[in-house]
Regions:
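Hydrophobic transmembrane alpha-helices and their helix-loop junctions in integral membrane proteins
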Residues: 1-180
Length: 180
């Protein structure tokens, strides 16, 4: 059910991010500064790419949102660990943690809104196939505008709630490695 997806993606995924920030980083800072942190960053980048590629070919609206969420959480984890590795090696500020908190909050709002909109669309069109959901702006223009605003926030367009956190996380990954 959609409510379960909203709960899992909007709140429960953020519990893992909180656990990493609150417990894992303070308990094992030296391991994260070494090869373990780099392995997590590489796996996170692989998760970002995998989630984005599967989301791009997906036609099921809930599946698309779920894999997009996987990609966002991969970015959050990559930003946290990249910033932690840079902090351990150079003593710079830990901005990835700040970006992770901001992005977790923004992503929680956006993904709950997307799942809610997907449920409304499913009830209207009786399908989750996005190829069969044309003409929404003609029948429900206010809903189409709201859906577009939520989509823009989820993609991290400037002047939306998803931009600030994504920018900070991408900056921390870029500080760690200019190629990634």
């Amino acid at each position: 059910p959609t409510q379960g997806s909203m709960l899992l993606s909007g709140i429960m995924l953020k519990m893992a991010v909180y656990g990493v920030l609150r417990y894992l980083l303070p308990i094992t800072p030296l391991a994260i500064g070494g090869i373990s942190g780099e392995i997590v960053i590489i796996l996170s980048v692989i998760g970002i790419i995998y989630g984005a590629l599967i989301a791009m070919i997906s036609t099921d609206s809930k599946r698309l949102i779920a894999f997009s969420s996987l990609s966002h959480v991969g970015l959050i984890v990559a930003g946290i660990f990249a910033s932690a590795v840079v902090t351990m090696r150079t003593g710079l500020t830990f901005e990835g943690g700040q970006g992770a908190i901001i992005q977790s909050f923004a992503h929680g709002i956006n993904v709950v809104g997307l799942f809610y909109c997907a449920d409304i669309l499913y009830k209207r069109f009786k399908t989750r196939d996005i190829r069969k959901m044309g003409g929404l702006a003609k029948v429900a223009p206010k809903f189409a505008i709201l859906f577009m605003i939520i989509l823009l926030g989820a993609t991290g367009v400037p002047l939306t709630n998803g931009f600030i956190g994504e920018f900070i996380l991408l900056k921390s990954v870029y500080t760690y490695n200019h190629i990634m």
